[in-house]
Structures are given as structure tokens and as C-alpha cells.
Regions:
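Short, small-residue-enriched loops and turns at beta-alpha junctions
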Residues: 58, 88-92, 196-199, 227-230
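A C-terminal junction/extension of Radical SAM enzymes
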Residues: 186-188, 237-274
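Short glycine-enriched, charge-decorated loop/helix-capping segments at active-site entrances
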Residues: 52-57, 152-155, 164-165, 233-236
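Short Fe-S-cluster ligation motifs
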Residues: 64-85
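Flexible glycine/acidic-rich beta-alpha junction loops that bind and position SAM and/or redox cofactors
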Residues: 146-152, 198-201, 218-239, 261-273
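Conserved AdoMet/S-adenosylmethionine-binding subsite of the radical SAM
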Residues: 91-222
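Short pre-active-site segment immediately N-terminal to redox-active cysteine/selenocysteine motifs
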Residues: 33-37, 45
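N-terminal [4Fe-4S]-dependent radical SAM core
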Residues: 1-29, 43-58, 71, 75-78, ...
Length: 274
């Protein structure tokens, strides 16, 4: 188990800044649907001009995704990681597991990973591990229902819609269970937290403590890109982001080289491969 984690930190460019100089990643945009509404999120499926999560130039079917992997590897052999990060939530889409299985059958040595809100993570971990997934990223913006209610418009779970504190509490419970189980199963776990000034900036310390206790290995504080219901907010200045990362480092290691990748990102982080 420790050897698997060590390999992830040597070769996964999102888990290691050193690895980002040597290895690349390829995101497969096969997951359009989502099961929560984040107030900072707008998803675009035919966008070639924005470099941020939730956008892609086009959606792919699982078969198209496999062909895309073959084409990209033919011209960029430094790709070590195949990830699914949207443009919706991977675990809200059946195509995610189908795609991962297809890719794993053809390219078993590549690292497979997903980025998810965590609502359905725990129950899907056995299938994900069977499909070759070795790393997961879970976006955790709040561990307090009071704070979470300001960030999430709704949570859709098992054919019911949960709003306000009830939705935020349900989401965090699922995230905690998923992070803990993933870590126990030997997966590398990174947590993304969007820094939203005036909403959760004073709360991220509690988030860091909670996700580290759950078993997460790494945390990535992502500055808000004002969109959606939060379009009127200002993004946090770089100095604030740096101070918060410094404050949280003694609790959990911090990722500091994030490029806020698109759902169809390809190439090397350190060479601007968006």
C-alpha cells in the first residue's frame, strides 16, 4: 500500500510538483451530469477559450475517449495519468466507469484518477479500484452545514433534493466516508477546496483538520474564479492564498502548482498544457 502511494507521489503531476516537470496528464471529458449545485460553477461543453474546471471543447463517449488516449500517447509519451474530472461529476455518470475500464484494459500501467464532489465516492470505490483507479481528488469546501449552505444550492441524492444545511450536512458526511474509505483501501487522496472570500476563507482551517483526520494526503486551496451566483465576488488576492496555504501546511501538505485544469486538459502542467 505504501509503495503504491509512493509511486503516485513520484509520477502524478497533481500530487507532486517535481513530477509535474517530468510527467503529464490527460483528462477525458465523458461526464456531463452533476448531482450538486455549487454557486461558483458554470459548466460549458463547447468552450475552447476558458481555462478552468468545468469546461471542455466537446464531450466524448467512452469509445471516443479510448481513441483519444491512443492519439495523445502517440505524440506525447510523457503522459502518465489518465483522469476524469468532468465537466460534471464523474460519479454521476455511468460513462465514467465504462471509460476507466476500457482504458485500464488497454493501458494498465497508466495511473487512473478521478476528481469528484464525493457524494457517491464511498459506494463506488470497489468498482473504481477494479477499474484501475489509484488516486482520487475530492472537492471539500466546507465541513460546517452553516458554511456549506452558503456554497451549495442543492444536493441531489437517491432521487431526493436536499437544500440548505440538510444538503451541506449530507454532502460532508458522504465526503468524509469516501475519503476515509479511499485512504483505507490504499488510494492516494487529494482534497480541493475553493477559497471563497467572505464565505469560507475563515473556515478552511477546520476543513484541513477534518480532511486530514479522514485520511487525505494532500490539500489544494484553489482561488475562486467568480462565476454563477458568486460572479459578483472578487477573487482572493495571491497574498491571501499564500497565507492560508502557509497556515494549513502544518496540518496537511499543500499543493501549490495547480493550473485549475479544464475537463479536457492534456499535456504537461509545467509547460502550460491546459
Amino acid at each position: 500500500m505504501e509503495a503504491q502511494i509512493d509511486r503516485l507521489f513520484r509520477e502524478h503531476p497533481c500530487f507532486s510538483r517535481a513530477a509535474a516537470h517530468w510527467f503529464g496528464r490527460l483528462h477525458l471529458p465523458v461526464a456531463p451530469d452533476c448531482n450538486i449545485k455549487c454557486h461558483y460553477c458554470t459548466r460549458l461543453y463547447d468552450c475552447a477559450n476558458e481555462n478552468r474546471p468545468g469546461v471542455t471543447s466537446r464531450l466524448l463517449t467512452p469509445g471516443e475517449a479510448l481513441q483519444h488516449v491512443r492519439r495523445v500517447l502517440a505524440v506525447e509519451p510523457r503522459i502518465k495519468v489518465i483522469g476524469i474530472a468532468g465537466p460534471g461529476d464523474p460519479l454521476a455518470n455511468r460513462a465514467t466507469l465504462t471509460t476507466l475500464r476500457l482504458v485500464h484494459e488497454q493501458f494498465p500501467d497508466l495511473i487512473k484518477c478521478i476528481s469528484t464532489n464525493g457524494l457517491l465516492l464511498s459506494e463506488n470505490l470497489p468498482a473504481l479500484q477494479e477499474a484501475g483507479v489509484k488516486a482520487v481528488t475530492v472537492t471539500v469546501n466546507a465541513v460546517s452545514p452553516v458554511v456549506g449552505a452558503r456554497i451549495y444550492g442543492y444536493v441531489f441524492y437517491r432521487n431526493r433534493v436536499y437544500r440548505g444545511r440538510a444538503g451541506a450536512e449530507l454532502l460532508w458526511r458522504a465526503q468524509y466516508a469516501g475519503i476515509r474509505r479511499a485512504a483505507e483501501m490504499g488510494l492516494a487522496v487529494k482534497v480541493n477546496s475553493v477559497l471563497i472570500p467572505g464565505v469560507n476563507d475563515e473556515h478552511l482551517y477546520q476543513v484541513a483538520v477534518a480532511v486530514r483526520a479522514a485520511g487525505a494526503h494532500l490539500m489544494n486551496v484553489i482561488p475562486l474564479i467568480p462565476r454563477g451566483a458568486f460572479s459578483s465576488l472578487l477573487p482572493p488576492p495571491p497574498g491571501q492564498v499564500a497565507r492560508i496555504r502557509q497556515k494549513l501546511t502544518p496540518i496537511i501538505d499543500q499543493m501549490v502548482h495547480c493550473r485549475r485544469c479544464r475537463a479536457d486538459a492534456a499535456g504537461m502542467l509545467e509547460e502550460g498544457g491546459a
